[in-house]
Structures are given as structure tokens and as C-alpha cells.
Curated annotation (Swiss-Prot):
Distributive alpha-N-methyltransferase that methylates the N-terminus of target proteins containing the N-terminal motif [Ala/Gly/Pro/Ser]-Pro-Lys when the initiator Met is cleaved. Specifically catalyzes mono-, di- or tri-methylation of the exposed alpha-amino group of the Ala, Gly or Ser residue in the [Ala/Gly/Ser]-Pro-Lys motif and mono- or di-methylation of Pro in the Pro-Pro-Lys motif. Required during mitosis for normal bipolar spindle formation and chromosome segregation via its action on target proteins. Signal peptide: none annotated. One of its GO terms (molecular function) is N-terminal protein N-methyltransferase activity. This is N-terminal Xaa-Pro-Lys N-methyltransferase 1. The keyword S-adenosyl-L-methionine applies. It is an enzyme of class 2 (transferase). The gene is ntmt1. It holds the Pfam family Methyltransf_PK. S-adenosyl-L-methionine binds at G69, R74, D91, V92, T93, L119, Q120, Q135. It comes from the Eukaryota. It is found in: Nucleus. Belongs to the methyltransferase superfamily. NTM1 family.
Length: 223
């Protein structure tokens, strides 16, 4: 839907890369000045994710997770490393990944890969991941690239694996953001793109207790 709003895909991606290169490699930088919401976000994500993890029929394993648009590793440090044996990070900004190695501290030894790559070009290793976590980054992909990326993520899942998309949700339609060269989609648009990727939404909920002035944030569990 938003592809008609994007006149030049090349500049759409290059301008986003340029924006993030000027962002300080801090939690506050990763959250656009809203570093204070990090704990609320992580706690909500942990409750969401733990509904699916465990042993037995239909449960998602805890071997390896992928953090997409990982930045300095905020989600890896506080959500994924406490729950998974190993984690991979992928982000388009090398400076953030370099910072992640120190930000993660001693636990960085359980990070197996730091991939510097835009998600439109990233190819997850087949059947490697129990969980692929995609937060606050899908707005940097065009519709077609998001669908293609989700399809590649599906092939990167282990049996009973899970894709989680957690992101801002517009009230209606698609809203472009010229500051960071991204878009914000409403739920109907997002649901259609998920279906195009051949995935099903098995659970969805809205993040609670965020400031009123920011977009609603929804988490979707996909298989």
C-alpha cells in the first residue's frame, strides 16, 4: 500500500541509513528519545513471548533467536539472551553492532553472529531460529520487501518456531515519516501483508502503558 507513497526505493533506503548513522548508539537513541519506556516495553514483550516458549507439543524452543533491526542490542540484552541459549543480531548500522559487543557485556559470548545488512537484503539461515524478533523496523521496508523478508524468515524457523512483529500501528492507512524515511501502517494493511507472506497470526495484543502521545504498538505472533 505504501509503495505508491515511495517514489524512489533507493533513496527510501539510503536516507534511512543516513538517518541512523547520525543517531547516538544509546538506548535513548534507539528509542527516539523515549528511553524511559524501555523497561515497560521489555516486560510486555517477555510476558508475550513466554506464552509460547517451553517443551512439548506446539511449544517454541529456546535454542536460538534472531534480533532484527537490533541496534545496540537492547532487546537482545534484556529479552532474548535471558530466554535463549544463543542469539544473532542483524542491523544496517555497523556502529550499533560494534557498540553491542560492549553493551551486552559478558553475555555477548552467547551472540554467535553480528550481521550488518538491511533487512531487504538479509537471508536468514534455513531452519536456524526458534524465534525471529522484528521490532520497530518493518516501517523501513516497502510492502513487497516486507512480504519477501517475512517469507525468508519463515524458512529460517525451526519446527514450532515463531516470528514476532512488534511495531507502531497507525489508526488508518499508511503514514510516511520523512524524518527517518519510514512508514507506519494500520493493522488492516499489516494483516494483509502477513497473509501475502503465507503466514498466520496465532496471537496478537497491544502493548499497554506507553505514553499517549506515541503510536499504539501491537505485537503479532506469526507462523
Amino acid at each position: 500500500m505504501e509503495d505508491c507513497l515511495i517514489e524512489d526505493q533507493t533513496s527510501f533506503y539510503s536516507e534511512a541509513e543516513h538517518y541512523w548513522k547520525d543517531v547516538p548508539p544509546t538506548v535513548d537513541g534507539m528509542l527516539g528519545g523515549y528511553g524511559s519506556i524501555s523497561s515497560i516495553d521489555i516486560n510486555g514483550s517477555k510476558k508475550f513471548l513466554q506464552k509460547f516458549l517451553g517443551e512439548g507439543q506446539g511449544k517454541t524452543g529456546t535454542g536460538c533467536a534472531l534480533d532484527c533491526g537490533a541496534g545496540i542490542g537492547r532487546i537482545t540484552k534484556r529479552l532474548l539472551l535471558p530466554l535463549f541459549r544463543t542469539v544473532d543480531l542483524v542491523d544496517v548500522t555497523q556502529e550499533f553492532l560494534d557498540k553491542a559487543r560492549t553493551y551486552l557485556g559478558e553475555e555477548s559470548k552467547r551472540v554467535e553472529n553480528y550481521f550488518c545488512c538491511g533487512l531487504q537484503d538479509f537471508q536468514p539461515q534455513p531452519e536456524r531460529y526458534d524465534v525471529i524478533w522484528i521490532q520497530w523496523v518493518i516501517g523501513h521496508l516497502t510492502d513487497d520487501h516486507l512480504v519477501e523478508f517475512l517469507r525468508r524468515c519463515r524458512s529460517g524457523l525451526r519446527p514450532e518456531g515463531l516470528i514476532v512483529v512488534k511495531d507502531n500501528v497507525a489508526y488508518e492507512g499508511v503514514i510516511p515519516d520523512d524524518v527517518d524515511s519510514s512508514v507506519c501502517r494500520d493493522l488492516n494493511v499489516l494483516h494483509r501483508l502477513v497473509a501475502r507472506a503465507g503466514l498466520s497470526i496465532i496471537y496478537e495484543e497491544q502493548q499497554q502503558n506507553f505514553p499517549e502521545e506515541i503510536y499504539q504498538v501491537h505485537a503479532l505472533a506469526l507462523r
